Amino acid sequence: MALPGLKRILLKLSGEALMGPSPFGIDPETVASMAAEVKEAKDRGLEICLVIGGGNIFRGMAGAAKGMDRAQADYMGMLATVMNALAMQNALEQLGVQTRVQSAIEMDKVCEPVIRRRAERHMEKGRVVIFAAGVGAPYFTTDSGAALRAAEMKCDALLKGTSVDGVYNADPKQDANAVRYDRLSYDRVLADNLKVMDASAVALCRDNHIPIVVFNIREPGNLARVLAGEGVSTVVGDGAV
């Protein structure tokens, strides 16, 4: 499905996307491959910012389920996203792409604080900006952080790279008869509790008219194909079914 007129996008990656074949942590070859995808998209003339989850290192909700204090566990998850952001920054800069990391939890020895106008200037100058540490507060997912940054940066679309090629009516890994949707409305996603992003993230995108594009980031070259309208994806937006 074509995505015309895009100038600025936010790409949301799960932390698990950086694991590659490993069961945990960061696989340098996989990060380098993801960075090449981002560079290819940037070379199309797009302004790009990223949000990366932290589930490959630590997931706050999983920690809370095992008895940890939820807020404490979420802060640990936020720190994991900073580690992933620094890994991606390194990979992008090795490809010659100037990159800045901005963290919602200030740590000025390793990255900038989140400053909206500074982030906008970075992108206008052709730099990639990676937003880390979610929204800087517990009880919010990195999906919510991605929706917030997409709204702040006035992005034309939020692209969510996952391990599947769109949104289905059932888990395609468990149900061979699962059907993929080409387009969905925000309200349909919320009403049917479809697993696109958490409800607060979808609502924030709806209120700011930011389309959500769900696609498979693990397929080489797929980000560029989706941006060209040639790849397989699901678009969540206004006026869809």
Swiss-Prot record:
Entry binding sites for ATP: K12, L13, S14, G15, G55, R59, T162, Y168, D171
Entry-linked PANTHER family: URIDYLATE KINASE, URIDYLATE KINASE PUMPKIN, CHLOROPLASTIC
Family classification: Belongs to the UMP kinase family.
Short name of one Pfam family: AA_kinase
EC number: 2.7.4.22
Binding site for UMP: G54, D74, V135, G136, A137, P138, Y139, F140, T141, T142
Enzyme class name: transferase
Organism domain of life: Bacteria
Activity: how regulated: Inhibited by UTP.
Keywords: ATP-binding, Cytoplasm, Kinase, Nucleotide-binding, Pyrimidine biosynthesis, Transferase
Main localization (coarse): cytoplasm
Subcellular localization(s) per the UniProt record: Cytoplasm
Record note on quaternary structure: Homohexamer.
InterPro entries associated with the record: AceGlu_kinase-like_sf (IPR036393), Asp/Glu/Uridylate_kinase (IPR001048), Uridylate_kinase (IPR011817), Uridylate_kinase_bac (IPR015963)
A Gene Ontology molecular function term of the record: UMP kinase activity
GO biological process: 'de novo' CTP biosynthetic process; UDP biosynthetic process
Protein's recorded name: Uridylate kinase
Family matches, as HAMAP family: PyrH_B
Pathway given in the UniProt record: Pyrimidine metabolism; CTP biosynthesis via de novo pathway; UDP from UMP (UMPK route): step 1/1
Catalytic activity: UMP + ATP = UDP + ADP
A GO cellular component entry from the record: cytoplasm
Role noted for this protein: Catalyzes the reversible phosphorylation of UMP to UDP.
